[in-house]
């Protein structure tokens, strides 16, 4: 999801109300073999297996949870997810900046003057440490990604700004930028390499390469996923793309086209990619709400053909949440090849007030939450 300026402002205001005295940092989750789970999340045919249970799973997204500075807020969210029956939480494992932030501001990596500096301090990756630790305690599984295509929280453009280039697309082919990117990946993966909380490592949030030949992203995906598997062969790896570029059941509309440099079927065929991802935003793509059901089934068919499950990783609308998104959930649950769905995005009442709302947010305890979470989890249980 590309965040609006208004949403970023809301997030900034929420974090600005928090004391700059950060809580005492928790140590990074143990990476010793004794701390490792007996089994990591995996695929099983066209389904996922979590903690020994194979089936369909529901989850959500929270880009902001790793930037919170109050541990109690993190625990509140994790507790609500667990009690709701949600199993997977996708979080942003990046927070890139191009200048030194003010004291008390959370940031993960600084790109400046041709070099990158990773922040492992109390206002850096130690905040993500607590998210991982809390997820372990609450039996929540995390998808952690490493960079954003969009400029929100730095993105690929932060690398381009520091190392030179004409745009985000240079990120994929620059040896210098890829070296810095892989250094960051290595730091994060090794930090949580045996945590029971990690569901999958994700290359990026919504990677695109407009007007590029599809080989550009294919080569980057293949190289990066193999690099990650070399660091952690036991974990699943996914792309984090929107599912663009698909011939199966195509109606010729923009998302099915290859103009963003993506070929869903070809990329899914890479042996170091464990499952496919797709996002769903008809309002942004110039399609109808009903169109979304066909988008889901088309990807299910592609994943079935590949022998790998699909994850409906993001989906949202700004109105009529229950009727529109509820229909998509039913389609996903009944479609062979789709193994889980994560709505965008989760909302809660934090110590500083409500978490950020981009119009898609589904807040805990609301009527929308009842239909899209409580009822959906019940439907999964009875399927």
UniProtKB/Swiss-Prot annotation:
Keywords on record: Carbohydrate metabolism, Glycoprotein, Glycosidase, Hydrolase, Secreted, Signal
One Gene Ontology cellular component annotation held by this UniProt entry: extracellular region
Localization annotation: Secreted
A Pfam family that the UniProt record links to this protein: Cellulase
Glycosylation sites: 17, 194, 263
GO MF: mannan endo-1,4-beta-mannosidase activity
Listed EC numbers: 3.2.1.78
Catalyzed reaction equations: Random hydrolysis of (1->4)-beta-D-mannosidic linkages in mannans, galactomannans and glucomannans
Keyword Coiled coil included in the entry's annotation: no
Main location: secreted
Residue sites binding substrate per the record: 92, 205, 281, 344
Xref: SUPFAM superfamilies: (Trans)glycosidases (SSF51445)
Any one GO BP annotation for this protein: mannan catabolic process
InterPro entries in the cross-refs: Glyco_hydro_5, Glycoside_hydrolase_SF, MAN-like
Active site: 206, 314
Family: Belongs to the glycosyl hydrolase 5 (cellulase A) family.
Protein name, as recorded: Probable mannan endo-1,4-beta-mannosidase A
